Amino acid sequence: MSEEQILNTHNASILLSAANKSHYPQDDLPEIALAGRSNVGKSSFINTILGRKSLARTSSKPGKTQLLNFFNVDDKLRLVDVPGYGYAKVSKAERARWGKMIEEYLTTRQNLRAVVSLVDFRHESSQDDIQMYEFLKYYEIPVIIVATKADKVPRGRWNKHESMVKKSLNFDQTDAFIIFSSVERIGIDESWDTILEYL
């Protein structure tokens, strides 16, 4: 795989968790952030592209990621898992705190190169997904759309679902759109090829 010539994707570890910028790593390593609704499969995405079973903790209970989690990949790149949005069982105050933390990171972090915005391939994008996409476009932050859980959609319906998701997002055709499945290991190489374009 081309990405392995550039970085050893299996040489990865969780570096730290941060609540605000005073806790961020203090160097110039490039970062790719991962954003998406609770339970869209962010942890599974991280584990799958890094070839690890449980580096990022997966949970059947949405809303488990409450801090910015920084993952070091081969000392050349960091993946940053931000708290999942759209989880109803969190208090308004807690949701507001998460929102502020995410916004501060996305709008002020010099290391940030692009955001992988994960959406559920089975459904139209939620209002939260649309707001996140519009936010990233407004701030001119490069965005990669990764449509997860593709194994739950029959292949004969993929074109229809891709069109549905893109239409609901008002998708910019210049952005990358990757169909992904952790279960069937679909979209791993394409995800890395796209991420590496931003380093």
UniProtKB/Swiss-Prot annotation:
Protein residues bound to Mg(2+): S43, T65
> Does the record carry Isomerase as a key word?
no
Binding-site residues, GTP:
36-43, 63-67, 81-84, 148-151, 180-182
Alphabetically ordered keywords of this record:
Cell cycle, Cell division, GTP-binding, Magnesium, Metal-binding, Nucleotide-binding, Septation
Task: Please name the PROSITE patterns in this protein's record.
Answer: G_ENGB
Q: Which GO terms describe its biological process?
A: division septum assembly
Stored SUPFAM superfamilies:
P-loop containing nucleoside triphosphate hydrolases
Which residues belong to any copy of the EngB-type G domain? 28-199
Taxonomic superkingdom: Bacteria
| Cell division as UniProt keyword | yes
Entry cofactors: Mg(2+)
Tell me the Pfam families matching this sequence. Answer: MMR_HSR1
Q: Which GO terms describe its molecular function?
A: GTP binding; metal ion binding
| GO cellular component terms, A-Z | cytosol
Q: Per its database record, what is this protein's job? A: Necessary for normal cell division and for the maintenance of normal septation.
The record's listing under HAMAP family reads: GTPase_EngB
Q: Which family does it belong to?
A: Belongs to the TRAFAC class TrmE-Era-EngA-EngB-Septin-like GTPase superfamily. EngB GTPase family.
* Protein name (database record): Probable GTP-binding protein EngB
Q: Which organism is it from?
A: Streptococcus equi subsp. equi (strain 4047)
What gene name does this entry carry? engB
